[in-house]
Amino acid sequence: MSLGPWQLFLVLIIILVLFGAGRLPQVMGDLGKGIKNLKQELKDSEKLSSNEPDR
């Protein structure tokens, strides 16, 4: 099941109400940093697991 345009619109409205328009750029920036860190940790984890000898 995918999100349709109305569901996305509703989610955006809820986010605006919760965080306010002034704080939204900061929240999105923090979210982007979190996603970037998660991707980096996954990449590092894959490197470590590929360097381990097979058992």
Curated annotation (Swiss-Prot):
The UniProt family comment states: Belongs to the TatA/E family.
Q: Which NCBIfam families match?
A: tatAE
Record's bilayer topology term: Single-pass membrane protein
User: What functional role does this protein have?
Assistant: Part of the twin-arginine translocation (Tat) system that transports large folded proteins containing a characteristic twin-arginine motif in their signal peptide across membranes. TatA could form the protein-conducting channel of the Tat system.
Gene Ontology MF term list: protein transmembrane transporter activity
Q: Name one GO cellular component term.
A: TAT protein transport complex
Any stretches that span the bilayer, and where are they? 1-21
PANTHER family documented for this protein: SEC-INDEPENDENT PROTEIN TRANSLOCASE PROTEIN TATA (PTHR42982:SF1)
Predominantly, its location class is: membrane
What InterPro entries does the database record attribute to this sequence? TatA/B/E, TatA/E
Its protein name is: Sec-independent protein translocase protein TatA
